[in-house]
Amino acid sequence: MSLKQLPTESMPREKLLQRGPQSLSDAELLAIFLRTGTQGMNVLALADLLLRDFGSLRALFCASKEQFCRHKGLGEAKFVQLQAVLEMTQRYLAETLKRGDALTSPQQTKLYLSSVLRDRQREAFYILFLDNQHRVIRDEILFEGTIDAASVYPREVVKRALHHNAAAVILAHNHPSGVAEPSQADRRITDRLRDALGLVEIRVLDHFVVGDGEVVSFAERGWI
């Protein structure tokens, strides 16, 4: 069936305008992004096929250029367009976080940290440097690789915190395995960093561990 044969209210763009983006399926949202189908396949059918081939929107978004462009109907221009959309989304989340108080919006903080860290193939140790009103001054990835007591250096963390004149920090790292449950090593390095930063009167407000679909907060567990 051609897309033009669908009732007007069932066309993705019209449906979005009438009912809002939340009313659309993943395939319908993707169809709006793709705009056109291929010969013999309308854009909704193409979107549905791509989601079945990749398995999910997330897998599609994480695909390399080679993986993306090998599918009929997708090319370099669409890949560039998708990367721009993803980067704008991440910058929107970062801007939202930096304009507010990180601690009064824990869910926004988790969402932002997940967007930054979740899909990394290697562990990355990330820090939000905060002022005395808990507003974000700067955010940095300080260490990459296996995160344990031997690879995260408290001296470097203290050095960066002093450089930014931070009054407090929020720590975060990802688990590429997808399991967000903190390890004993995670708890030990958190204690070491809290002790080191405490010597210069900089507070560790929280440590988030980012997994696949879950973000664990040390503060919510009562560990900080």
Curated annotation (Swiss-Prot):
Keyword field: Hydrolase, Metal-binding, Metalloprotease, Protease, Zinc
All residue ranges annotated as the MPN domain in the record: 102-224
Domain of life of the source: Bacteria
CDD domains found in the cross-reference section: MPN_DUF2466
Annotated GO biological process: proteolysis
Spans annotated as Disordered: 1-20
InterPro entries: MPN, RadC_JAB, RuvA_2-like, UPF0758, UPF0758_CS, UPF0758_N
Chain location of the short sequence motif JAMM motif per the record: 173-186
One GO MF term attached to the UniProt entry: metallopeptidase activity
Short name of one Pfam family: RadC
Residues binding Zn(2+): 173, 175, 186
Family note: Belongs to the UPF0758 family.
Record's protein name: UPF0758 protein VC_0217
Organism: Vibrio cholerae serotype O1 (strain ATCC 39315 / El Tor Inaba N16961)
Organism ancestry: Bacteria, Pseudomonadati, Pseudomonadota, Gammaproteobacteria, Vibrionales
